């Protein structure tokens, strides 16, 4: 027997209507309970086991719910003492749960399921309509009566079966809410309110200690009830005329649009008198309209057929789907939300927070999203429900913040931040969107707490804001989410733009109120290890700990953080958001304008907004008087920004004509300075930015040095640098030959400029070559071997190396021939690697003295830097001797560092007093002769002193050495 025949026989045996009776009462069959159990078993064995929807499809075609289940539940007398009738009603509820379960398709869904998907969804809509409206909602009352029996049992006496009945009834309520959610949300809320199901939910959450295992199902019901409803709509002053107000606004917008269209519409006569014809290679375009006289190009564009290129976009579930709520449903939902907030929000939130902390398997990823969304809704609802009436004299911010006290717990904030970071990293965009909504409402609530009259609430708000802004990870996460917006939903874009503006405002206020604001920054701290020292096990463990992510406190600079948003990605997101201005309200438009104001006016990043798409959006909004009319409250702020923007753009185009070419393209960091100021930036080359210094081992000839360096560069795959250097040398040789042919003396004395007399700068044609001039130590050594000199120019990289005039043309030709020889035939070294012939120089620490250092100090006498008998040199010699005797004393390191610093200071001081003067030449000659004699005398004393010190050292007389050093220093 076929399966459909079996199912049809079972359904027929359940019962049917008695048409002989005037009331047509439904009569149960003798085996009605057994038949209902058989249908449940078939659903489990066939549909759930094999993941097909065959039984569901058969039951929908037989209209089991409409013709059998609803009449059975409706005609039941709700007498829970009659076990047989109650058991039949329970069997009907057990069948309704799988039949109303949400239908979801996956990548591996069977083709047969996809074919019947539309019919099953239509059948579920009929199921919901029957359950809600059959005999004025008597079915919902019967379902609630089924639940009364396990609820009336004391908590300690409830069995697993009782808990299972509570669970399936709650799941049935959840399923009914999810079917045709947007279309029938108002009817569902009204039916649930009349059947006292909303009161049941409030009762369960207020006694959650007895029903702690059902917190997840209660969360799902509450989420589906409030999803898409704005709390502001529930507290509208004209709640009774909401539909009328919305209808009037739509009619006014339609009349304005019709009036605007009629003004520019075609008539019978405006097609005569003017014609434009354009002949192309393949066809002719002809337009007859009088608008060609003034708006010819626009008229041509209006006749184009734009074929928008299809893009494959990912569609994510928008959790904040809005719907219009009527008066009756709004009143019922508002009353439920008020009771839920007063009685059950804190217990439900604390219970779910515990489940998340212990990672309860009942909590699924979708429940995390629902919890965050419910939190954001009730935080906003709390401000509206507790908001006092606004009068002309006083306006208070004293809300009942205790209604949501569980949200202000430190544990809740930690969990929220964790969910926010995890959802972004795992690309769970719905959960991340809910976390952004929750963070936005939390910041709004904390702002209200700081403005209230209670000092306790003010301290709580200040503490929470400090904890939120202390996490730099969250601040950077918001910036990264805005920057990398791609194909998420519009609700996601709305949430991230709102959070960005609110976060910047609150962070600016908080940082300005605090003298110092620190944030926690994660960094990697790698421990330096000496290769010559063997570490113990403890050292290895400490190195592993130091290699992990370390945390440090860093002083927060709001201006620097705000400047991060001067980025093409962030601006792209807000431009895309503003392009939908026809669907935005005044607050959303004002939000976008305020962001552009921060970028353009406060941060003065004008160039980033000089974009053709942004200019097009502003122009379209300025000329649109239908969807962005003068009655819009954001129109005035927009016009002020638009006028200021156009004035700055006009001035920039006059000053930097290259901006005309850059308008259609995103701006790069390299060209930002030039487009902003019309000139190239000047970058200072700090000593730490330069690469390491190398030198060859002693004993090599010039030919061997060049061969070793070239071989090292070839082994490092840097032949392109050598090729470009050969090209540069050939160019320099050609220039020198031209100078020689053009009478070099005349060129130097008359025609040459200062830069060419000083030498020719080495300029690279590629970025890699210019980087090597600064960073590559081996390549810099090769330049020195080729006769180039490194200048003291710390502004431009291309002026860092130059070829002096002392290098003759024959030397240049020789260097070019050597490079060509070694690159064509790379040199080899028998038994030695070319890298072993190069050693790295030790670069000392550079300390720049302050302006007040060394100018008025009379403690020490200034000596010349090359004087062998300075105090620093004598002290250094003594330190070398004592270092041999006291290797383990740490004071030696301090003395050496001190003497090194003093030696550098003496060098700077003596160099400072060298004055270039040509007036006292005879005096200078006598002075230099006396100084030379003094240096010779001091050198003799030094040699005698060091000889005496060596003799005493051999005898081991350390005290006499120190006494001798002190006497020599006093001399």
Swiss-Prot record:
Pfam families: TIMELESS
Keywords: Cell cycle, DNA damage, DNA replication inhibitor, Nucleus, Phosphoprotein
Gene Ontology MF, one: Y-form DNA binding
Disulfides per UniProt: none
Biological process per Gene Ontology, one example term: replication fork arrest
Top-level lineage group: Eukaryota
InterPro entries: Timeless, Timeless_N
Gene Ontology CC, one term: chromatin
Annotated compartments: Nucleus
Residues with the Phosphoserine modification: 528, 536, 970
Biological role stated in the UniProt entry: Forms a fork protection complex (FPC) with swi3. FPC coordinates leading and lagging strand synthesis and moves with the replication fork. It is required for programmed fork-pausing which is necessary for mating-type switching. FPC stabilizes replication forks in a configuration that is recognized by replication checkpoint sensors. It is involved in termination at the mat1-proximal polar-terminator of replication (RTS1) and also required for activation of the Rad53-like checkpoint kinase cds1.
Subunit structure: Fork protection complex (FPC) consisting of swi1 and swi3 interacts with mat1 cis-acting sequences and mat1-proximal polar-terminator of replication (RTS1).
Protein name, as recorded: Mating-type switching protein swi1
Gene encoding the protein: swi1
């Amino acid at each position: 027997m076929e399966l459909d025949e079996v199912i049809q026989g079972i359904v027929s045996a359940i019962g049917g209507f008695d048409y002989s009776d005037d009331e047509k009462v439904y009569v149960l069959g003798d085996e009605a309970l057994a038949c209902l159990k058989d249908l449940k078993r078939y659903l489990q064995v066939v549909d759930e086991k094999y993941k097909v929807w065959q039984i569901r499809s058969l039951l929908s075609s037989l209209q089991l719910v409409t013709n059998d289940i609803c009449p059975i539940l409706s005609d039941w007398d709700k007498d829970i003492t009659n076990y047989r009738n109650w058991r039949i009603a329970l069997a009907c509820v057990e069948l309704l749960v799988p039949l109303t379960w949400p239908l979801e398709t996956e990548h591996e869904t069977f083709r047969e399921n996809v074919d019947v998907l539309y019919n099953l969804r239509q059948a579920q809509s009929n199921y919901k309509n029957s359950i809600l409206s059959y005999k004025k909602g008597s079915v919902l009352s019967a379902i609630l009566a089924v639940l009364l029996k396990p609820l009336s049992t004391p908590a300690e006496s409830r069995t697993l079966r009782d808990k299972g009945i509570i669970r399936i009834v709650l799941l049935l309520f959840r399923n009914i809410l999810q079917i045709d959610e947007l279309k029938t949300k108002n009817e569902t809320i009204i039916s649930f309110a009349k059947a006292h199901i909303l009161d049941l939910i409030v009762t369960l959450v207020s006694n959650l200690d007895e029903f702690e295992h059902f917190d997840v199902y209660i969360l799902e019901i509450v989420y589906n009830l409030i999803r898409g409803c704005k709390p502001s709509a529930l507290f509208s002053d004209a709640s009774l005329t909401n539909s009328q107000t919305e209808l009037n606004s739509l009619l006014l917008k339609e009349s304005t649009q019709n009036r605007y269209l009629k003004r520019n519409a075609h008539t019978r006569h405006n097609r005569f008198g003017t014609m434009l014809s354009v002949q192309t290679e393949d066809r002719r375009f002809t337009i007859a309209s009088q608008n060609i006289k003034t708006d010819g190009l626009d008229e041509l564009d209006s006749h184009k057929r734009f074929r928008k290129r299809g893009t494959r976009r990912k569609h994510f579930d928008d959790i904040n789907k809005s719907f219009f709520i009527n008066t009756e449903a709004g009143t019922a939902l508002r009353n439920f939300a008020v009771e839920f907030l007063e009685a059950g929000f804190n217990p439900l939130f604390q219970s779910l927070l515990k489940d998340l902390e212990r990672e309860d398997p009942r909590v699924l990823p979708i429940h995390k999203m629902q919890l965050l969304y419910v939190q954001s809704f009730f935080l906003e609802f709390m401000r509206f429900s507790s908001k006092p009436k606004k009068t002309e004299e006083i306006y208070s911010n004293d809300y009942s913040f205790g209604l949501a006290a569980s949200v202000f717990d430190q544990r809740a904030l930690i969990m929220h931040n964790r969910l926010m970071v995890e959802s972004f990293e795992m690309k769970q965009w719905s959960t991340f969107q809910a976390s952004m909504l929750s963070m936005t409402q939390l910041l709004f609530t904390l702002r209200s707490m700081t403005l209230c009259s209670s000092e306790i609430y003010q301290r709580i708000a200040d503490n929470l804001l400090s904890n939120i802004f202390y996490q730099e990870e969250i601040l950077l996460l918001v910036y990264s989410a805005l920057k990398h917006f791609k194909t998420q939903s519009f609700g996601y874009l709305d949430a991230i733009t709102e959070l960005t503006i609110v976060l910047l405002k609150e962070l600016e206020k908080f940082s300005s109120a605090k003298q110092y604001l620190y944030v926690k920054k994660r960094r990697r701290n790698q421990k330096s290890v000496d290769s010559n020292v063997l570490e113990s096990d403890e050292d290895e463990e400490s190195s592993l700990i130091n290699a992990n992510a370390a945390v440090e406190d860093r002083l927060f600079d709001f201006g620097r953080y705000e400047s991060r948003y001067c980025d093409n990605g962030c601006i792209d997101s807000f431009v895309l958001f503003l392009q939908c201005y026809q669907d935005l309200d005044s607050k959303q438009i004002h939000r976008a304008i305020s962001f552009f104001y921060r970028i353009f006016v406060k941060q003065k990043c004008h160039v980033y907004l000089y974009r053709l798409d942004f200019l097009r959006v502003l122009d379209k909004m300025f000329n649109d008087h239908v969807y962005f009319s003068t009655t819009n409250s954001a129109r005035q702020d927009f016009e002020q920004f638009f006028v200021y923007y156009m004035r700055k753009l006009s001035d920039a185009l006059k000053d930097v004509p290259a901006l005309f070419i850059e308008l259609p393209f995103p701006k790069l960091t390299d060209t930002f300075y030039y487009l902003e100021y019309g000139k190239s930036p000047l970058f200072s080359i700090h000593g730490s930015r330069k690469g390491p210094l190398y030198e060859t081992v002693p004993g090599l000839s010039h030919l061997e040095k060049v061969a070793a360096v070239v071989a090292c560069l070839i082994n490092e795959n840097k032949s392109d640098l050598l090729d470009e250097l050969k090209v540069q040398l050939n160019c320099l040789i050609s220039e020198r030959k031209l100078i020689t042919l053009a009478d070099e003396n005349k060129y130097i004395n008359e025609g040459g400029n200062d830069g060419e007399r000083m030498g020719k700068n080495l300029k690279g044609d590629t970025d890699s070559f210019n980087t090597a001039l600064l960073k590559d130590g081996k390549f810099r050594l090769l330049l020195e071997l080729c006769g180039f000199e490194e200048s003291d120019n710390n502004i431009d990289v291309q002026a860092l190396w130059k070829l002096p005039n002392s290098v003759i043309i024959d030397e240049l030709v020789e260097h070019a021939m050597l490079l060509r020889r070694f690159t064509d035939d790379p040199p080899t070294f028998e038994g030695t690697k070319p890298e072993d012939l190069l050693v790295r120089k030790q670069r000392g620490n550079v300390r720049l003295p302050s302006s007040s250092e060394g100018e008025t100090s009379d403690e020490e006498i200034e000596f010349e830097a090359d004087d062998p008998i300075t105090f620093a040199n004598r002290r250094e010699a003594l330190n070398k001797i004592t270092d041999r005797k006291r290797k383990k004393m740490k004071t030696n390191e301090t003395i050496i560092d001190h003497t090194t610093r003093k030696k550098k200071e003496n060098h700077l001081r003596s160099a400072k007093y060298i004055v270039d003067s040509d007036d006292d030449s005879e005096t200078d000659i006598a002075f230099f002769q006396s100084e030379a004699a003094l240096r010779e005398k001091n050198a003799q004393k030094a040699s005698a002193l060091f000889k005496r010190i060596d003799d005493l050292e051999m005898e081991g007389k350390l005290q006499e050495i120190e006494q001798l050093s002190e006497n020599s220093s006093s001399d």
